[in-house]
Regions:
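Bacterial N-terminal signal peptides that target proteins for export
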Residues: 1-6
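C-terminal motif of bacterial Sec signal peptides marking the signal peptidase cleavage site
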Residues: 15-16
Length: 403
């Protein structure tokens, strides 16, 4: 729980109707002028975006998506910037706390240039420029306080997706539930866990009457919110030619097809996260037992902006503790350190780009071997009659005998 005290609250004005700065507008108009894209729409309104380069196409994709569904793109920025408290109050600040404790934005700042390929950075930066160009052209969009959207906002979206699919959020919720129960009843929750996910079906010529290869993808996505599918076709002269579904704020197709291959994903929920029960020094709550010795937690302060009412917000300061295992979560009278696969990895963007540029089973599998996308079942089909199932999991190597 986030506790609010008068000494930790700063009352400030929230200017929700902030206008864009003229000097910034000039800067981002100049950036936008380096991209050229063509957007045409079919009878269903689906955008078909063409650009000479991948970056041009990404710029056009962002503009088309903003044209159709800017609300979901913009509201994702609350999450990507760890400002959900400004949208949902205390409940949103809990998500912000987790994102800030995990230092997701700091990792992106530190590793953006070294970990992301130059071609990938060009695409991400062009996509952010496309969103900003649409905002400039539509100044009454209601979300000018997010201008300018940056390339690092876009990367944060991919890192946070990894967080949500790592199982660490479910682990935290389970620890909170169990803290309210007698110990003998906690095992009941293990039997209540179940997997809900998506469907993908691939069939080749061995099972079809007309000797065709087909893939059917039904990913059970909502029509609104951060996981709402958006359908688009994006094509460039650099070999990018994908049509399918993507999330708000994503420059890459997540499930779909090109002229040679197609793939879909389903949720598989491998065991990717661990919680370490720490023994805290009864005489010093800022120490824990490590290899027979009491050692100090690393302690930092996290600032969480929270919407109050009208144009008012609070900034709450909360302590964050770190052990050698990872950030520490205090549940009731117990302290747990959290760790999960991919918690410091921002290379998901590289992998999605490589998959989008794949044109054969070999290329697609090579992209999947990156394993920066830490979970999902992959189902694949191609024009050469290949079908393939991949249980994808970036599972940690654990020492045997440890619970």
């Amino acid at each position: 729980m986030i506790r609010i005290s008068l000494t930790s609250i700063i009352l400030v004005m929230l200017v929700s109707c902030k206008s864009m700065d003229d000097s910034q507008i000039s800067i981002y108009l100049e950036k936008s002028s380096s991209y050229k894209a063509q957007i045409t729409r079919d009878v269903w309104g689906v955008p078909h975006v063409y650009g000479k380069t991948d970056a041009d196409a990404a710029f056009g994709l962002a503009y088309a998506h903003a044209e159709d569904d800017f609300k979901n793109i913009a509201e994702n920025m609350y999450l990507y910037r760890a400002e959900m408290g400004l949208k949902d109050g205390i409940d949103g600040a809990i998500q912000d706390y987790l994102i800030k404790v995990l230092k997701i934005r700091e990792q992106i700042d530190e590793n953006y240039t070294n970990d992301l390929n130059a071609d990938v950075r060009k695409v991400i930066e062009a996509y952010a420029a496309g969103i900003n160009y649409w905002m400039i052209k539509n100044p009454s969009n209601g979300y000018n306080h997010f201008f300018p959207v940056t390339e690092k906002d876009i990367v944060a979206g991919f890192s946070i997706q990894n967080l949500f699919f790592s199982g660490v959020v479910s682990s935290i919720e389970k620890l909170q539930r169990e803290s309210d129960l007698k110990e003998e009843y906690t095992s009941l929750y293990r039997n209540q866990e179940f997997v809900t996910g998506s469907n993908v079906l691939a069939v080749n010529s061995r099972k079809t009457h007309d000797q065709s290869t087909r893939i059917i993808i039904n990913s059970h996505q909502p029509l609104d919110g951060p996981l709402a599918w958006y359908e688009a076709h994006v094509r460039s002269d650099e070999g990018w030619n994908m049509m399918g579904g993507l999330f708000p704020g994503s420059p890459f197709v997540f499930v779909g097809f090109n002229e040679n291959i197609a793939w879909g994903f389903t949720v598989n929920k491998p065991d990717l996260s661990d919680s370490y029960l720490l023994e805290v020094n009864p005489e010093n709550e800022n120490q824990y037992l490590l290899d027979g010795e009491w050692v100090d937690f690393k302690i930092e302060m996290v600032r969480l902006p929270i919407k109050l009412f009208g144009p008012l917000k609070w900034t709450v300061k909360r302590e964050a503790k770190y052990s050698v295992h990872g950030p520490v979560l205090e549940v009731a009278d117990k302290s747990y350190a959290l760790r999960f696969s991919g918690m410091s990895d921002i290379k998901q963007v590289n992998q999605w780009y490589a998959m989008n540029k794949s044109n054969s089973l070999e290329e697609w599998l090579e992209a999947m071997k990156m394993r920066s996308i830490i979970s999902f079942n992959g189902v694949y089909a191609d024009r050469k009659d290949n079908i393939y199932f991949l249980h994808n999991s970036s599972s940690p190597l654990r020492k045997e005998g440890i619970d």
